[in-house]
Swiss-Prot record:
This is NAD(P)H-quinone oxidoreductase subunit 1, chloroplastic. HAMAP family: NDH1_NuoH (MF_01350). InterPro entries: NADH_UbQ_OxRdtase_su1/FPO, NADH_UbQ_OxRdtase_su1_CS. Keywords: Chloroplast, Membrane, NAD, NADP, Plastid, Plastoquinone, Quinone, Thylakoid, Translocase, Transmembrane, Transmembrane helix. It is found in: Plastid, Chloroplast thylakoid membrane. NCBIfam families: PRK06076.1-2. Disulfide bonds: none annotated. The lineage of its organism: Eukaryota, Viridiplantae, Streptophyta, Embryophyta, Tracheophyta. The chain crosses the membrane at residues 30-50, 104-124, 127-147, 253-273, 300-320, 343-363. The keyword Chloroplast applies. It comes from the Eukaryota. PROSITE patterns: COMPLEX1_ND1_1, COMPLEX1_ND1_2. NDH shuttles electrons from NAD(P)H:plastoquinone, via FMN and iron-sulfur (Fe-S) centers, to quinones in the photosynthetic chain and possibly in a chloroplast respiratory chain. The immediate electron acceptor for the enzyme in this species is believed to be plastoquinone. Couples the redox reaction to proton translocation, and thus conserves the redox energy in a proton gradient. The keyword Thylakoid applies.
Amino acid sequence: MIIDTTKVQAINSFSRSESLKEVIGLIWMLVPILTLVLAITIGVLVIVWLERQISAGIQQRIGPEYAGPLGILQAIADGTKLLFKEDILPSRGDIRLFSIGPSIAVISIILSYSVIPFSYHLVLADLGIGVFLWIAVSSIAPIGLLMSGYGSNNKYSFSGGLRAAAQSISYEIPLTLCVLSISLLSNSLSTIDIVEVQSKYGIWGWNLWRQPVGFIVFLISSLAECERLPFDLPEAEEELVAGYQTEYSGIKFGLFYVASYLNLLVSSLFVTVLYFGGWNLSIPYTSIFGLFGINQTSGVFGTTMGMFITLAKTYLFLFISVATRWTLPRMRMDQLLNLGWKFLLPISLGNLLLTTSFQLLSL
């Protein structure tokens, strides 16, 4: 049997081209993910720097000023130090749970960013159940904290892990009920659709005016989910040394540090998306840019402006969260649980029932 060499070469060339297409497709698929991770990292560094500057201003002292101009590189210096510190393991602890816990806490929060729309065309995954995916994924983080507390074989760590789980359950329910109210108003669970519904009437179409009670409950619950003062009971220094972080050092301790700020950023982003119109702005900025001859119809211009508006609103709430941390004292554990179960839960449930009633009457 005579084999045609021309056909063999054609087949080999075709297979190589198909393999090249698969590689290019894989790279093209990873580019948005890597871009999002890079943007999240930069956002965390900015939050750390802002918190140090704001806290220094509130306490009337000088903040970081040596590492870079205005101390902007201080967070990078601290992260580098933690990266090269020794990773100490507890001798009688569960090493597997101890090592897996920080990773679960960070990964579950990073996955939440996949459904956040920074602009109409700038979202990693436009899912029909976007807000529920965020709630479901963020509920995994307390499991990692509980694993860390149990795996440390330390009474302070275990108490901190139990507090983190109890606090998360207490405030996850009111937060979910507030999200359900927003979904009923928008007739959708997609984050893109929720923002688009708010764009019809400018600033007066924001869910802030349609759900003022839900906004307050959501804001308090999101702060409690981030375990920030006055809700930082799981890592209260005076009672539990450092809570579930007590036995950690090096990069694993740094992961908890990063997870805290990642959670704060994602909560502020969802406040912007759900209640403050996302990338929409009532000010007619397009006419202002038109005076300078800037092409307003291009997709790049719209995406850039949408991302800028979203981040501007987000960092406003970050400022409020940071100022709250350095202003209010810590609550007791019984006060924290009573606030969640006896106050926020009935209010959020009543808000959901009222929203459902109004939606049924409007049909």
